[in-house]
């Protein structure tokens, strides 16, 4: 489980800016212990535990990038065509002990090892073959159409840094240097539950003032997409003692506990008090909209050696989504040993006017369309309440308004974050 100190997220201000939150996580939260070796076919989505060093060069030998003729560049005329004798033939995979001599060319195919002495390859469609000779044109640069040993990755270099979240391309690189297994961090173990007397299980009996619980399903899907092992603890009622017991029990065997609902200041919002009764709630408001009431802290189990990070999210599902991708995800990456992720909002033209308060980061759900001039522009969803789930299903991503922005007008450019980028 996560070994955390009570002040690991410590912040003394009333509203925590997102940049300060990310800095505190990076400085004061340590990755969980535990490393395991997995085969390449099971490695996607896992986090490398150590630097992966290339045991061989990539490519391991000089080879041709095309079907054509290997030559010595020193033999080529700068004034016109050069006629060379075709002295051999090399296929991909064939063991080559051929050495090219002055005035010769070797017929070669893509991937075949370059003959000793050759440094340049002419594509077959650029030459003229006449019996046992080939005429090659002037102007080709030394090394053209050739792939040299180690140009992709020299032997002994870092192929994959520690903290890499492995995707298909990383697994392919590991295979290309001959590896069959990788050492990765163990998966994070995360417990989730929803709170509220008004929340019921989907498919269950719903009285007139109740709503079906969507938040646990949203959180489970997001967590599993990021590689965590999820324990679903269901729905807890608004009972302070019951919440405290559930939190205390959930800290055992889990690295992180994530809840939704009950972190605001209402009379029925008991999560904050429950956390403070069994641990430390070190901040509970972040300068973000939607989702300002976000609690983060540490909860302790029955044993003094057991503790888990805690995040309490708001109850509205859109606020849950936004705060998860911008608050929980950086914490997950740090706990899992992954390198920090830098989001790069792409500037798009805004097709609406908007005003916001200063000193908070704000996210607006938008769809992308082509303007009359063909340029991409963002259109705000007509309903922007934090409980409007269709505002997530009917849009393409979020516009990110920085803390110092107070208004935008049609035609302004604002950073756009796609849902795919936010969730991966």
Cite the ranges covered by each PLM segment.
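Flexible glycine/proline-rich
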Residues: 19-22, 36-41, 50, 63, ...
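Short, glycine/charged-enriched hinge/interface segments at domain edges or termini
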Residues: 2-19, 69-232, 237, 377, ...
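Helix-rich terminal scaffold detector
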Residues: 1-18, 180-313, 317-323, 334
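Structural signal for hydrophobic packing residues in well-ordered secondary-structure cores
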Residues: 29-33, 51, 114, 157-163, ...
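Solvent-exposed alpha-helices and their adjacent loops that cap or buttress functional pockets
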Residues: 62-64, 76-79, 97-101, 114-116, ...
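Generic structural signal for well-ordered, non-membrane alpha-helical segments
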Residues: 14, 18-22, 36, 40, ...
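Intrinsically disordered, low-complexity, positively charged segments
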Residues: 11-73, 77-81
